[in-house]
Every structure is written in C-alpha cells, then in structure tokens.
Amino acid sequence: QLSESISSFAQENFESMKYLDFSLDLQEKLKPTFSIMSVNEIMKIDSGTIFNQTSLNNHDSDQTLNIGFGSRKLLNDNTLLLGANTFFDHQFSENHQRVGAGVEAITSIFDVRANYYNALSGRKTNDTGTIERAMDGWDLRADYHLPIKQDVNIFVSAFEFENPESASSYKETGNKYGADAKLGNFLLEGGYQDDNQANDYWFGNITYVVNFGSGEKDTSSNLTSLTDVSDKLYQPVKRENKIRVVKISASGLVAGGF
C-alpha cells in the first residue's frame, strides 16, 4: 500500500517525522495550489511536544515556503490540547516575507484557533509590472466535530487583512464557512468565502495523509462528552500559508490576491 510504503520510508530515514500530507487546493477564478506539509517532533515534553511544521506551496508557478515552530501540551486527563506557534513565510518569485504567531485549543467536541500575520517585506514589482505589498492580518477559526461515528467537522472563520502602509486604507474582511471529512487516508474540505471586496468564491481541497499509525481513533462511543485527544498532538497547525498581497496598478487601482 502506498501510504504504508511512504510511512515506512519516512520512519526509517526521518525518525522525528510525525505527520506528512500532499494537498491540492481549488478556488474559483484561480489556478490550483499544490502543497506538501510535514510535522516533525523536536523534543518530547511532559504530556506534550515541541515541534517543527514545514510546508511548500506551488501556486501558478509561484512557490511559498512556511517554516514554523510550536509547542503543545495535553491537560485535563488528555481531554484538552493547548498550543502556541510561530512561523516565517517566504514567497520566492517576488520575495514577499512575513512572520506569524498563533494559539489553539483543541478538544474532541470543538477547536478554537487564532493567527496573526505581520508583513516584513516592502513593495515589490511582479513580472507584469504591477506593484505588490504583503498585507498584515489575523484570522479566527472555530471547528465543531459532529457527534457521529464518521470523522466530519463543520467550521466558520473570520479574517481581516490590510495594507500596512499608513497612506493606504485598503482592507479585506470577511468570513469562511465549510466542512471537512476524513475518508481513509483522504481529507476532503469544501466551503465558501464571503468578503467586503467582491472576492466571494467557493473553495475546496483534497489532501492525502500518510498514515504514521498515531492518528487513528475509535469514535464509536462518548460522542457528546470530552474524550482523549492525544491522537491530535501532531496534527498540523491550521493557518493561511499563502501570503496575501495588495496589488497596485499604474493607475492607482488596488486589488487583493496571493
């Protein structure tokens, strides 16, 4: 089986690797994004871990690298998982850069996450002559795990991104709504984004998750009470890995994008 072969190779050659996936993201009016992501344990701590998360995204011949470090700790008889993380994001074609920080609270019934993004790079000119500027921003996300045997979740998120230049008033605010489901080694997600810049769109992704043998859990009992979430210790941080930019044309018109 493909997953077992990849898992065996990773465990033999990368002992610290705890999670690995390959993903295809689809969004209306944009070309697809292909990505690979891994979570690697740096150090075990009491009822927790210190870890590294690395991902590489390819969108429209544009690559973005995300390198993050975080800590997670299990509390309350392993029914609550708290975490904090920090990231550095680098987009290669225009050399956009930013840093980010996040916190998370994870249970068997619901999860809450918050992320902040701070642009480091200034104005850049892309290959079409358009000026781009990485944006500052934040997002909040809540996931509810449906009380059924299948691994199905619904989520809602809010976000705000803005041009950090003091002379600019450009801002993107909005919400995302969606659901995801785990089917064997595949994770399927779909939803809708609604924002204030007429950039509303449907989105979806399909992710192939390599089975390392630590993420399987029986969900057939205690569906409405808090249960052990130690199986989520190495799940990836949920954040926006592509760098949002504001695009400024020669006429002065502005638009958001990646």
How would you label these PLM feature ranges?
Residues 33, 49, 54, 64, ...:
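Residue-identity detector for threonine
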Residues 8-10, 32-45, 63-77, 99-116, ...:
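Feature captures outer-membrane beta-barrel proteins of Gram-negative bacteria and organelles
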Residues 18-26, 47-58, 80-91, 101, ...:
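Transmembrane beta-strand segments that form the barrel wall of outer-membrane beta-barrel proteins
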Residues 25-34, 56-66, 90-97, 164-173, ...:
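Solvent-exposed loop/turn segments connecting transmembrane beta-strands
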Residues 1-63, 249-258:
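Outer-membrane beta-barrel initiation region
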Residues 1-12, 120-155, 159-168, 182-187, ...:
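Flexible, glycine-rich linker and terminal segments associated
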Residues 13-29, 43-49, 69-78, 84, ...:
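Extended interaction regions within the primary functional domain
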